[in-house]
Amino acid sequence: MNRDSTPSQTEIEYRQVISYCKALFDKKNKDYGTSWRILRLPSLTDQIFIKAQRIRSIQEKGAQKIEDGIEGEFIGIINYCIIALIQKSLEGSDQMEFEATELGRIYDEQVEITLELLRNKNHDYGEAWRDMRISSMTDLILMKIFRTKQIENNDGKTLVSEGVEANYQDMLNYAVFCLITLKNEQQQQQQQ
């Protein structure tokens, strides 16, 4: 939010991306329920890795054999990061099923926490991400995945670094930035 309490352009675009991701999350929840509750955090990290690695492969090769584009992979990264944050927040709980409204509230809660992190970082760094290449942000997502894997291999212990939550939040935000950038690039191409 700006000083006058109106949302910034970034927040508006961010919420548009998240709204689309949540709608897909809700549909998959209707199809599969909360079967993802069985996944441990390292399994979710690996799912995020698969998505990010496919994006990088497509970026490097300039082609793909499977029809789904990178946009869908970024959406998957966002939803898997939110699922991981939900899982982390529910550590110790053996509850497997959630009512749709409760699950929606928990999803939104993790988004709001992560959006607050974005606001704080944008305050300090400006909107540097807007000048970054999508390929660079993809590399940063992959780096965060490898950091997360190392933390997981160390039983979640760090000496001076942030824990896995911060890495999931950063990956989520970079994936949102990539989708915003892709959308803006598509709009610019259509205007030409």
What function would you assign to each model-found segment?
Residues M1-Q192:
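Intrinsically disordered, low-complexity regulatory regions
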